[in-house]
Amino acid sequence: MAKITKTFQYGKHTVTLETGEIARQAGGAVIVKFDDTVLLVSAVAAKSAREGQDFFPLTCDYQEKFYAGGRIPGGFFKREGRATEKETLISRLIDRPIRPLFPEDYKNEVQIIATVMSLNPEIDGDIPALIGASAALSLAGTPFKGPIAAAKVGYKDGEYILNPTVSELKESQLELVVAGTANAVLMVESEAALLSEDVMLGAVTFGHREMQKVINAINELTVEAGTKPSTWEAPAKNTALISAVQEAVGPRLGEAFQVRDKLQRRDAISAIKKDVVESLAGRVAAEGWNPAELSKEFGELEYSTMRNSVLDTKVRIDGRALDTVRPIAVKTSVLPRTHGSSLFTRGETQAIVTITLGTARDGQVIDAVSGEYKENFLFHYNFPPYSVGETGRMMGPKRREIGHGRLAKRGVLAVMPSLESFPYTIRVVSEITESNGSSSMASVCGSSLALMDAGVPVKAPVAGIAMGLVKEGDRFVVLSDILGDEDHLGDMDFKVAGTAEGISALQMDIKIEGITEEIMKQALQQAKAGRLHILGEMAHGLTAPREELSDYAPRLLTIKIHPDKIREVIGKGGSTIQAITKETGTQIDIQDDGTIVIASVNAIAAQAAKARIEQITSDVEPGRIYEGKVAKIMDFGAFVTILPGKDGLVHVSQISSDRVEKVGDVLKEGDVVKVKVLEVDKQGRIRLSMKAVEEGEGASAE
């Protein structure tokens, strides 16, 4: 196939899609050029599903190569290793809008690989990767109901910005990624500076409107490439099996869904399924039915039973109304030796959140393609198997945990103090101890309380809520504070975090082929009411940060010295700074601009270290009297240390008003004496006098 190219303007950027020259053995492959950021995105689908495959095995891998930024990776092996947090998050970002656009019965393995091969530091790889994934899938001839497109939206001075650069995002009040088809939105991911619901909805519609040119370009590329439509057909429904399962279940599933307790409800449904399997075992064998199909049909019946019930009755499976939030309980200072902690419980979802305060050196150094930087606000989310009453392997964080942690971090980021005003590295850890839906939003609420408990000067309390949707045709209901089953059996997971003032984070994932602006508007308004209710409940714990830090948290003292004096504080081979830290028990960080941060749990020790540094960096003042220690005796006088690292000479003629024949007769090394500074010459040599002090001249040094 000859090389085919499509070029269009997308905001301020020129975008080019190329296919037919590179990776020609892949099902579909596209080079995406977004100005100087260049990605190769491939899509390959297996010819058939594996035997017994009962889920859609879609894998999305986003990878950034260090050569893209003209850098060599660090570490011993000098090559890219396991996926970074950023790569994991963008891999999830690609997966989320693509997965719902494959047919329910399609079980062939599909893999999308997006590789950043050239990186302009001003243009991130997320939007090009999403565009490339959509184009590659469209070219691969899969039963993909796309194409989709994506846009990044910023907001400044009341205006939306399409695909802002990295520099523009630093000044923006919003960073929002929206993806969707020509007709509907499928996914939203955002971080905001406490913006209103109307501004957020406007950003989504703005992004969706602007992305139409991308969809048109992909359609044109696919036509010119002569891509053949997919020949895959969904397997025929086994109507006899479906009728048999429905008859065997009867009204029992509807009754099971009335059980309020999650574990009891699961047990009741499992008992019904077991009975159905046993009662139909003979017929399954006689008819040659696949047992996996029976299990699948039972799941379909679960799905329709719950959905029809809530649509018809407007009552949910735990008895709540559509907009009711589960009971909330909050506690703070639950762990005595942590710097801050909270216990947040909402129904059967629970999180213990802890705060640890450290110094700037405790920040995480990240070796990125665009350059090395340090992260001083860390948010870690852990989801152990016991939280849902299961067993499982305890390994490193999975993709889901990394994604949920990032969302919760976005939720509180807007209220965090700047590093200049609160120079601590802050680590938040959310341990999910129970889960029945919305654990990431429980982490937002719990972290807000724990941060205030730690005395971190956050601007306002933050709460989060997860919304759901059940939609059949023109009928739909929006659910507040969804359960795990409502998430699993519903059509939308819509999470909103924010303060009483506005939204700080919004994430939306749609399992159907998009939702309308009307549904989004209702969900946002319902989420606001729920968020305000939760904030009211959280106020029973704390409403503002504590005035004092924990007794176990480090106290930070910040002083500023002239950069030229840094080497005096460090000393030869680090001797001076090591002596101060050892003798005072403090931790000292020195920055290139002369900022010195002293950390110590003991405030007195921190003050002592500060005094030592001020002594070292202070200038010797002519005419001032100092108390010093005799450092060395010479025939012509004595050297006296008046400040750390600063020695001056008391000439034999300046020791006393009386005649001194031999210096050693009057002074010995280690003697403490008062001296007056007579002169500091151009070479920095200091002339001192004891005689002048005797004669009562000069001012006494403090």
Curated annotation (Swiss-Prot):
EC numbers on record: 2.7.7.8
Subcellular locations according to the entry: Cytoplasm
Positions with a binding annotation for Mg(2+): D487, D493
UniProt keyword annotations, A-Z: Cytoplasm, Magnesium, Metal-binding, Nucleotidyltransferase, RNA-binding, Transferase
SUPFAM superfamilies registered for this protein in UniProt: Eukaryotic type KH-domain (KH-domain type I), Nucleic acid-binding proteins, Polynucleotide phosphorylase/guanosine pentaphosphate synthase (PNPase/GPSI), domain 3, Ribonuclease PH domain 2-like, Ribosomal protein S5 domain 2-like
Pfam families associated with the record: KH_1, PNPase, RNase_PH, RNase_PH_C, S1
Swiss-Prot/TrEMBL cofactor(s): Mg(2+)
Catalytic activity as recorded in UniProt: RNA(n+1) + phosphate = RNA(n) + a ribonucleoside 5'-diphosphate
Family affiliation: Belongs to the polyribonucleotide nucleotidyltransferase family.
NCBIfam families to which the protein is assigned, alphabetical: polynuc_phos, PRK11824.1
Protein name: Polyribonucleotide nucleotidyltransferase
Lineage, opening ranks: Bacteria, Pseudomonadati, Pseudomonadota, Gammaproteobacteria, Lysobacterales
Gene name for this UniProt entry: pnp
